[in-house]
UniProtKB/Swiss-Prot annotation:
Taxonomic source organism: Vesicomyosocius okutanii subsp. Calyptogena okutanii (strain HA)
Protein known as: 7-cyano-7-deazaguanine synthase
Gene3D superfamilies, per the entry: HUPs
Pathway: Purine metabolism; 7-cyano-7-deazaguanine biosynthesis
EC class name: ligase
Amino acids binding ATP: 14-24
Family of the protein in this entry: Belongs to the QueC family.
Reported function: Catalyzes the ATP-dependent conversion of 7-carboxy-7-deazaguanine (CDG) to 7-cyano-7-deazaguanine (preQ(0)).
Binding site for Zn(2+): 194, 204, 207, 210
Keyword Lipoprotein: no
Enzyme Commission identifier(s): 6.3.4.20
Length: 230
């Protein structure tokens, strides 16, 4: 726990989803001064950006920025390509078509740059190794490798102000994440998890993200108040 009179800055990657919102709440509970960062990268679920903006206001982040980048032209992902359908949930060990190449590397790089501007040595990201659909950039080994790179590649790093990338959800399943968030007062109806939510944030109910969310609430024995299309 940090001294409330001397808050330490942290950049929080905030998508507007369940995991990133819980991560922001955890950072706030640890008394970090939070700066939230979201991305408009051409994703189909544009409503999650509105969720991110609303959540940043509710948690009173010191600043919330939305960075506009285009990954649709260089990415063959169902999340960014209108010609590729988001598939229904399926149990598979293969990396799914919803994987966006290098997405977390790009997002963390922006967070790293902003953290240097803010003279900040802490970044929070809501990845986890259990309910992550097989994405390679959600693993602890990847995060550690990025952290090493960041401290070799930045002015702060070589001057001894070492960056720490916090992954408070890394070993939690969805039910544990939900329980943690509820204990911190999160209203999960404000979050958007679905890969193809409509403009009002209503979830499809059949994609991987929706199924993991449904299962999480079921296992947590908490009513799921998410608005689903099906």
């Amino acid at each position: 726990m940090l001294n409330a009179k001397h808050k330490i800055k942290a950049v929080i990657l905030l998508s507007g989803g369940l995991d990133s919102t819980t991560t922001l709440a955890i950072a706030k509970s640890k008394k970090f001064e939070c700066y939230s960062l979201s991305f408009d990268y051409g994703q189909k679920q544009e409503s999650e950006l509105q969720s991110a903006k609303n959540i940043a206001k509710i948690f009173i982040t010191s600043e919330h920025r939305v960075v506009k980048i285009s990954l649709s032209g260089i990415s063959k992902s169902a999340l960014t390509n209108d010609n590729i359908d988001v598939p229904k949930f399926s149990q598979s060990n293969k990396i799914p078509i919803t994987y966006v190449p290098a997405r977390n590397t790009i997002f963390l790089s922006y967070a790293l740059a902003w953290s240097e501007v803010l003279n900040c040595q802490h970044i929070f990201i809501g990845v986890n190794e259990l309910d992550y659909s097989g994405y390679p950039d959600c693993r602890k080994s990847y995060i550690k490798a990025f952290e090493i790179m960041a401290n070799l590649a930045t002015k702060q790093g070589i001057e001894g102000q070492k960056l720490t990338i916090h992954t408070p959800l890394i070993h939690l399943n969805k039910a544990q994440i939900i329980k943690k968030g509820l204990s911190l007062g999160i209203d999960y109806t404000l979050t958007t998890t679905c890969y193809q939510a409509d403009k009002n944030g209503k979830a499809c109910g059949i994609c991987d993200a929706c199924e993991y969310r449904k299962l999480g609430f079921k296992e947590a024995k908490v009513p799921d108040q998410t608005r689903y299309q099906t």
